[in-house]
Amino acid sequence: MSTVEKCFMLLLVLLTTALQGQTTEPKRSERYAKAYEKYLGASCPVPKDSIQHFVYFARDRELIKDHPLLSHPMFKGAQIMYSWRELEPEKGKYDFTILREDMEYLKSYRKRLFIQLQDVTFNIKYKAVPDYLLTEEYDGGVVMQYNDDDSPGGWVAQRWNKTVRAQFSLLLQALGKEFDGKIEGINLQETSIGVRDSVFSELEYVVALKENMLSLKKSFPTSTTMIYANFIPGEWLPGDDKGYLRGIYQYGEQIGVGLGGPDLMVKRKGQLNHALAMMHEGQYTVPLGIAVQDGNYIGETGDIDNEKKNSTHHSIVPLLHAFAKDFLKINYMFWVDQEPYFKTDVLTCFSRE
């Protein structure tokens, strides 16, 4: 074989390998696309099992009063979002009054409180951090985050800023001192953010998340701790895997912080290739959690317009439960109190036995 022929054969092999790689990657990204089909036969009633079910209230805590969850045997309690701003009205001065009220109210019905600590918002009119952080000393404390269409989407606490993070750690310590062992658990908000800060670093952000996780665990050695780890800026799985999200899951398992995610979307590729894949593929001793949030009851995310809210739909609650239990091996499920779906789909499907 001549030199020219050898070169041609080598080029052909390289081209074939490259083409195989191109066809393999799409298949990897589709590997769980039909996983939900196994659970299409799931039906009501959803029986009592090992999953701890909580009803989620997104900063509308007053709705727990006389709520149906209080008398329902399937629900262990309420997950309520509290903003950093509410809990620390002034620097170093904490006010946990609403936490105590909610904890005691739930306790009177033999239910438990699960705290979600808010430092990120999806509303440009509201910042979840105390006013003192919005100063030059903390570089403004927050930055704008943007939606996929480049429109402003809310505000993100500068988790990657050491001075901001130090204050967050002090808040966790104060919370843990009073509530560790008294509440069911506490979780940090999702890791997914859409920022354009000139000083933002992907690597520093991952380090910051891990530091917050460690602070959380040290502050709450007894109650369940959890972080909603769904996406990390700068990588997109499975093709562009820089180890960011994977590292968060490994670290959580290492230090004893539970791992979870918002938005149980069983048909959405993004969710299937990130948080849901991490849960399905890993072996964990820490608790796993998944949230059914606004829109998820009809396969959407975020706020749903009135037309969709009022349209006829088929309940997917049995499917979501079966998928979470078998495919994800979940320990905690957080069902948002979204009308009309919580009453029409969840309450009617959950067994009272």
Report residues per predicted region.
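Aromatic-lined carbohydrate-binding surfaces of glycoside hydrolases
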Residues: 44-207, 214-216, 222-241, 257-259, ...
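Substrate-binding cleft of secreted/luminal carbohydrate-active enzymes
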Residues: 29, 114, 118, 255-353
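Hydrophobic h-region of N-terminal signal peptides that target proteins for export
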Residues: 12-21
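Mature N-terminal, pre-catalytic/accessory segment of carbohydrate-active enzymes
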Residues: 22-53
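Bacterial N-terminal signal peptides that target proteins for export
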Residues: 1-8
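Acidic (Asp/Glu)-rich catalytic clusters
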Residues: 67-74, 101-109, 179, 216-218, ...
